[in-house]
Design a protein with these regions (language model features):
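Ligand-binding pockets and gating/stacking loops
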Residues: 1-447
Length: 447
């Protein structure tokens, strides 16, 4: 059983606020902004409007980035990808999502996401911390602060990054998985994609584990002396982190050895499943972390920023991610873990229906679009096989059941048994929370 509140390691008394639906979250963040109309938001009627000017009437207050604000023409660029229906509910998916199509009955597609941020960094920061202003705690840090850890030998919150094979992605800053003004022990531990996933994972040559233990004991004594003199909570955090690092020297080497998985599992995730730093490897590692009680597992995959050559870009990104994303869902389900895991997929915003740059049948670019885009959820307490929300004929604005960033965050916390208005932290004279003064749980997508 999950250890929460008083029974968890480092959790708050009184949490969870109510019975949780899930024990953990795996958040597959697609950095760069996937194009909703090229993957999920099927608009077949637009094929007849290829090259026509997108009506100004549907962009009454549309902000544009500097990459398209100077364009004289905004021609409609319908998707060049084929769509078909899948699953019992006939969910529309584009051709590159052939693996996800097989798991779609476990997935709730939300077509009506929206945000107010139009550039990558503030938009990603809003999704990860609840604010466009840097410095707030990340969602994983809030969860770690509230619920603590289920495994004393691993962090409660782990972050991993990968990059698309076809395109370099936007920079990702450590503050996206940082603790902000929460105590530092709640920040995410980043597993690196090259070399040892964690620096200093192995002792230097000639240094035994017993010697490391004696050295750490001596250092802890000095730190405890300083803590008693200055009453600085950062010192207690430092002691706890040193101890966790010592335990991770034993737990992490076995964790990251994906080659120990059966061939059938490796084949399911694809050829990159044993290559550190690749998305498939990170998906498999996410399942292994989930098995070992890690509370919040954050993957960032870059390369979705399709300002040009969008059809080939989307296809390449799906080749990198579709098989292993679907494999993660299937793997969790086969092990009986999907029922107590929430899997979240999506980026920081969507893309425009109008073309950025020159438009041809084979090539078009898409600018950033905050007004509507797609996320999906799967796992414990989520209604699988449904599509929630709707957009207009051009996939420009939400027309039914809008879901804001803060609503998504409130819903994720709710599934973990956390009331988003009650998980707070006092800093500089006022109480902060992940959802600020906003957010409502999207109960219609929950079972």
């Amino acid at each position: 059983p999950a250890r929460t509140g008083r029974n968890a390691i480092g959790g708050m008394n009184g949490l969870p606020h109510f019975t949780p639906k899930v024990k953990r979250v795996i958040y597959l963040f697609q950095s760069g902004g996937p194009a909703q109309m090229d993957m999920f938001d099927y608009k077949p009627a637009l094929a007849k409007r290829f090259g026509e000017e997108v009506p100004e009437s549907i962009y009454p207050a549309e902000r544009k980035t500097t990459m398209t604000s100077g364009q004289k023409s905004f021609p409609c660029a319908p998707t060049g990808l084929k769509f078909s229906q899948h699953g019992q509910a006939g969910t529309w998916l584009s051709e590159p999502l052939k693996h996800l199509a097989k798991q779609i009955d476990d997935v709730c597609v939300i077509k009506s996401m929206f945000t107010e941020a139009i550039n990558h960094d503030p938009a990603a920061t809003l999704f990860q911390t609840g604010s466009v202003i840097p410095g707030r705690p990340s969602m994983g840090a809030w969860v770690s602060y509230g619920l603590g850890s289920e495994n004393a030998n691993l962090p409660a919150f782990v972050a991993m990054t990968s990059n698309g094979t076809a395109k370099q992605g936007q920079p990702l800053y450590d503050r996206l998985w940082g603790a902000g003004f929460l105590p530092g022990r709640f920040q995410g531990v980043k597993f690196r994609g090259q070399g040892d996933p964690i620096l200093d994972l192995y002792n230097p040559a000639g240094v035994t584990r017993a010697q490391r233990r004696r050295m750490l004991d001596a250092l802890n004594k000095l730190n405890q002396d300083q803590a008693s003199r200055f009453n600085d909570p950062a010192i207690a955090t430092r002691i706890a982190q040193y101890e966790l690092a010592f335990r991770m020297q034993m737990s992490v080497p076995e964790l990251i050895d994906t080659k120990s998985e059966p061939k059938s599992v490796l084949d399911m995730y694809g050829p990159d499943a044993t290559k550190p730093g690749r998305y498939a490897y990170n998906c498999l590692l996410a399942r292994r972390l989930a098995e070992r009680g890690v509370r919040f597992i954050q993957l960032y995959h870059r390369g979705w920023d399709a300002h040009g050559n969008a059809p080939k870009g989307v296809a390449a990104q799906c080749r990198d991610t579709d098989q292993s994303t679907a494999a993660l869902l299937r793997d969790l389900k086969q092990r009986g873990m999907l029922d107590d895991t929430l899997v979240v997929w999506g980026g920081e915003f969507g893309r425009t229906i109008y073309c950025q740059g020159k438009l041809t049948k084979q090539n078009y670019g898409r600018d950033h679009h905050p007004n509507c885009f797609t996320y999906w959820l799967a796992g414990g307490g989520v209604k699988g096989g449904i599509t929630y929300g709707e957009t207009d004929d051009y996939s420009v604005n939400v027309t039914e059941k809008p879901v804001h960033v803060h609503d998504l965050q409130a819903t994720i916390l709710h599934q973990l048994g956390i009331h988003h208005e009650r998980l707070t932290y006092r800093y500089q004279g006022r109480y902060f929370r992940l959802t600020d003064v906003h957010g409502k749980v999207v109960k219609d997508v929950l079972s």
